[in-house]
């Protein structure tokens, strides 16, 4: 964080079963601990920004919503760990319902939105022109949320996004599987403030 001079960061798959395990000087850390296998999310904000926890989900889904003020702009930062593609609709629903609710609520209150998450979604070339996969079932659900709330998919802004692949896996048969399932979404009012999105699949 110091080398990047970051004020806000988001981490998924912390695998934390209890809060308070991690500490970072001059940051307030918000965690959604994982009650089942895998997962766990964290959102850290510089103490100088006086962050306030808006919502925390950690039972049926993982989602953290924190608000802070930068200049005159009130921004809601959202991170989380999306449901697996092969889960039933009943298991997927809590995450997407919570995500849409938090986005809609923030917009109705005049807040800007910045979302970075392990979405477990393939959005396809509709949103990410060089995506190597077609839109998946989870992608269809997220697509509805994007359209309903007029969000910008930063991964798809080719002039600002450094790469497409966010996940790379080497199989036992020597193949390399690549995907773009980690996404950054912002409210339309933040698009012009974005300088770049640097992606490292390693």
Question: Where in this protein do the model-derived segments appear?
Answer:
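A shared catalytic/ligand-binding motif for oxyanion handling
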Residues: 1-202
């Amino acid at each position: 964080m110091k080398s990047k001079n970051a004020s806000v960061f988001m981490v998924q798959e912390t695998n934390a079963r209890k809060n308070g395990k991690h500490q970072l000087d001059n940051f307030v850390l918000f965690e959604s601990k994982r009650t089942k296998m895998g997962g766990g999310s964290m959102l850290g904000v510089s103490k100088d920004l006086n962050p306030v926890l808006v919502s925390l989900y950690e039972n049926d889904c993982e989602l953290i919503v924190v608000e802070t003020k930068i200049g005159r702009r009130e921004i809601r930062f959202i991170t989380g760990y999306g449901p697996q593609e092969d889960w039933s609709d009943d298991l997927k629903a809590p995450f997407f319902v919570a995500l849409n609710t938090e986005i809609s609520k923030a917009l109705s209150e005049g807040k800007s939105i910045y979302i970075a998450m392990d979405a477990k979604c393939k959005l396809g070339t509709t949103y990410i022109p060089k995506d190597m996969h077609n839109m998946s079932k989870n992608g269809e659900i997220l697509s509805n949320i994007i359209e309903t709330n007029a969000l910008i998919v930063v991964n798809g802004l080719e002039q600002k996004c450094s790469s497409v692949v966010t996940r790379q896996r080497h199989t036992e048969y020597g193949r390399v599987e690549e995907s773009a399932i980690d996404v950054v979404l912002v409210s339309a009012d933040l698009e012009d403030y974005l300088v770049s999105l640097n992606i490292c699949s390693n």
